[in-house]
Amino acid sequence: MINVGAFVASARSGARVVVGGDARGPVVSAARLGMKERLFAFLAHVPLLKHCDAVRRYAEQVRMENRRSLEVFVLALSKRYGPEGAKAAFDYGARRDGAPLDQRRVRNMVSIAEHFHGTGDAKPLARQMVFRSWECRGLDHPGHASLTIKNQADADAGRHVYEHVSWWPNQRLGSKEHFDRIKPKTLDGYRIDKRSEISSATEQRLREGDAARRKILADGFKYANQDERYDARFFPRAGQKLDKDAEWGLSARKVYFPAIGFNHDRRDTDRPRAFVLFGLNEAAMLRDARTVKEGAKSGELKYRMISKKENCASMALRVLRAGGAEHFVPYTAAWISEDPNHAHAYALAVQARIDALNQRRADVERRCERLRDSASVRQAWRAFSEAGGASASPLAEDAGRGRASAHMRQARLDEHAREVERIGAYFAELSAGRSGKHRDRADAALADAMKRCAPSARDDVAALTRKASVLVETLGRHLDAPPPSDSSALRRLAAHAMIGRIEAFMAAAIAA
């Protein structure tokens, strides 16, 4: 089956992409661009010659190839990003009928499909945060921003968490009320947000268009009057769709973030839960979201459309920052007023940094596993590990589920503190035998990171995130080159073990 990657790879040459095929099936490739093709492409733009039969046949053949390529590409986008993402890519990216599917168009259509599908590796996770925004196009179309905290990790659906923060004025604003502080209201779900972001006039046209098409389909086109034929041409644009209650709404841009702690892919419940080291603090975000809603009820908080702190975008950003977004990307406030576009850009930056760190963490895990392929390294590391015998997993599981008693948690924190000290001493012992001339810059950077990033029970989530990011990135760079000796491989395994201690302390910190 042809996938999106095949189109992206073929488009890199700069030529238009075509879909051919043989007995084995369709094949994507870059179009041939020899002297004949170059000549006909030039003649097709010459007024006196473009109507010649040979030139017209060539131009029509190219248009047919381009249409077929576009159809197959949209199908590939649909399979990867869903029908909504593919429709959006077609609506906004394929603007001219028969236009070539070149590198720029492929890149733009993939970007649009990703945008409507949602951005972020956390989308399939059971514990996630979703930042949603609708584009701001001025005071007449201000857009909107909201945030949802989801936790579907528990097998019991009754214990699932769905906390939605959507900040709205309690009344329709007049043209002179953009600076007024008025009573706010909060909406409880994304579906209501979608309905609120589509105008009544657009909704009416969509209903009329749908009704006209149904009537024409049932009665036949020749029996339709002029008004029905006109209404039938009004199709929903990308993002406009009916919900399960047959109400029209406008879908948002979505950015997905993982929650720190144990998580799993909802699509594959058989796989064991894995600890997500880099993410947002779910408990802190829930506390702030509920504080915001209580403030709306009590009147302590107000809504002001043009504001840095009291409009929809600023409230969504407030809850996002409460979860530790600034641990990854510094936040810079808007000069005059927050808006959904600025908020969306910040959310994307945070998501990109979190996903990059988690991908680097997974890469470090795989590379360190390969270090144990050496029998001597594996034996030496097993001897060190068995001498300590401590493990972060019981603490992390119990802390994450809230089942460990305070006494047990403290005992395990003490145990992990001792293990941190033991790993640090082992790393120092391995490094002591290396003279200055044998230590390169990478060795010095890793040794410095091990000193500065050793976790402790006093560290909060921010400190642990900072230490983890420094150690993961430093060790990742160190692993780019193969270890020159067993002691070098063991130093890397010790640094990897220190990351495991950070995970254990992180589990305790988010449960506190």
From Swiss-Prot:
Coiled coil region boundaries: 347-377
GO cellular component, one term: extracellular space
Subcellular localization: Secreted
Pfam families: SicP-binding (PF09119)
Family recorded in the similarity comment: Belongs to the BopA/IcsB family.
Function: Plays a role in mediating bacterial evasion from the host autophagic pathway.
Record-given protein name: Effector protein BopA
UniProt organism field: Burkholderia pseudomallei (strain 1106a)
Lineage: Bacteria, Pseudomonadati, Pseudomonadota, Betaproteobacteria, Burkholderiales
